[in-house]
């Protein structure tokens, strides 16, 4: 496991709040096992089924922070194209989107969607995650060609401003959930 990701896992595990911007995929904390498996199969070349199983298990283990006694406050903003991008099969997409909608019913999980009709937004440069906890510097994970985790204040601040802007462009929580379920049923339901 790369050092940058180990750093992120520690920050994520200790976080009291997480802000996530994802313009291309359902973020790992909200993925189903089938969705994660389809992603890993698409991303990895020449990897065994056992290795894929281990990656999926690790992804699902990360999600246990949402079930702890004092879970972090999680705010996720998705680009609407995430809802329309086929990962795996149509049934997998349906199930993945219903899962996101159900998780968003938890009081500490907010999922908002930026409609494609909004056009360009402040987050089109790539996905990022910001973890915060009392007594610790905020940690930023930037996802892209060269993934990295950093506590560099200028980068964290820049990402926080971008997050506030994309969140401001997004539909409210309930309207976002309605859109997620509409796409799940209208586009992906078998």
Annotated model-derived regions:
Residues 1-84, 134, 150-190:
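Interdomain hinge/linker segments and adjacent boundary elements that couple functional modules
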Residues 89-190:
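C-terminal regulatory/effector modules of DNA-binding transcriptional regulators
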